[in-house]
């Protein structure tokens, strides 16, 4: 068969790859030795290209378990709550006193990361070797660890022929058209008053999307609908975000913890179940030691069970850090039942995310 033959059909598969490095310096390392399974956790970090995927490093100076008690253990941990796993390879090394890379060790395969799961090397470096070469590896009692992460992105299949641009999804056309009605106040039949600002809207759309608005329109006298409907306890920006969701099913600015704090009560009040789900997702993606307590209180107040579970798991995982915050100390006084639930969650040693996942990589000098 000739190698110069022409192919009638062909295609290709392309994969995107994202790479970034993180350097972590641990000062006064000799005072951080602790015992077996005692860990040190780095600050949260992410790549410049993808801030939504958050990571941290963990070091166990005296090993992650009894088997590795004579070694330094190091791990990479995924912190973000994502809908699908993250596939990544990684490499660790130490920076010595000369600025050189030492003990370069890489994962032999692409690892599948789920939320709170960690992968790494429980026998990264013999502790005796580290301490006996402290002048070189621990200059000024500082341990500097570097990690290079390579994330495998989506795969794209490229067809063999030019394709006519796809027709836009009719559902997107519908939401665009409804969004235009809202944005341009076209053919409106009611007026809503929010903190002194008037917004024109459509009763049929509001009634179809919100059982609260539906009940309001069913029971109000026709005469009263000629005057603006007062919306209480909402600021205009949050109201616009809620209305954008009512008309288009999207909440374009619902990506921060602060906006989610304001939108969740509105979604709960007006019976917008899907918007509550979007709020839960925003909270989960932005969970931190600082806001975990407030997130738990909101989840309990507005009966969002998924978010409450995530908040309890997060607090259990970072119990020592969370318990030092002023928010936690305030909750001890104001919401003792949530403190009890948090301790119950902490006591559940079966939580799968607490168990380190170890890969058997070989150290390479």
Swiss-Prot record:
Example of a GO biological process term: protein catabolic process
Domain (MATH) ranges: 19-149
InterPro entries in alphabetical order: BTB/POZ_dom, MATH/TRAF_dom, SKP1/BTB/POZ_sf, TRAF-like
CDD domains, per the entry: BACK_Tdpoz (cd18521), BTB_POZ_TDPOZ (cd18344)
Record-linked Pfam families: BTB, MATH_2
BTB domain segment(s): 188-255
SMART domains: BTB (SM00225), MATH (SM00061)
Membrane spanning stretches: none
Family per record: Belongs to the Tdpoz family.
PANTHER family linked: SPECKLE-TYPE POZ PROTEIN
Name the record gives this protein: TD and POZ domain-containing protein 1-like
